Amino acid sequence: AVHFASTPPQISPDGEYAVYVQDAVINGANELWSVRIAGGSPVRLSDVLVSGQSVKFAISPDSHRVVYLVDQDTPGVPELYSVPIAGGAHTKLNMELASLPGQVRDFLISPTSERVFYAADGAVNNVIELWRVDIDGGASTRLNAEITSSYDIFDYAVGLTSGGSERVV
């Protein structure tokens, strides 16, 4: 049986694709899918996910990639992945996490579709910090100054300056 998840589908900014979570391969386990709105076969974007997992995903502003947050490789450890919207190999975006269960808490895609900004327990155990990585993978860069174990990064926003540069606050 094919079942759709409670996560609402998203339409790509260019209107070409729908991206959605569906239980289509193994009964009780979800996967992330895309399909051309004009027609065609659905393409699975993620591995089969453990039953009951929620998947947070976003489509890049240029409609080329889907970034998603889920514990795909290690149960109980949410991590960040990027995959071409038309299908292909997914790439883990986050660095090795500081602890188990470390985690990526959330993410934002830059308005230029070039980078992903994310909050994660990365360099210091049990401290959520702000990181940046290219949307197609590579080394992550920590954006905040050193934080002690008493503090975390909770909120942030990404935008463009009048000159077209990315700004994170």
Give a label for each model feature.
Residues 27-33, 75-81, 125-131:
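Structural motif
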Residues 1-5, 36-53, 84-103, 133-154:
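Multi-bladed beta-propeller domains
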Residues 17-21, 65-69, 115-119, 167-169:
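Residue position within the beta-strands of beta-propeller blades
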Residues 1-2, 32, 165-169:
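Low-complexity/repetitive intrinsically disordered segments
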Residues 13-14, 61-62, 111-112, 160-164:
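Residue-level detector of Asp-centered blade-edge/turn motifs that repeat once per structural unit
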Residues 10, 58, 108, 157-159:
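Conserved beta-strand position repeated across blades of beta-propeller domains
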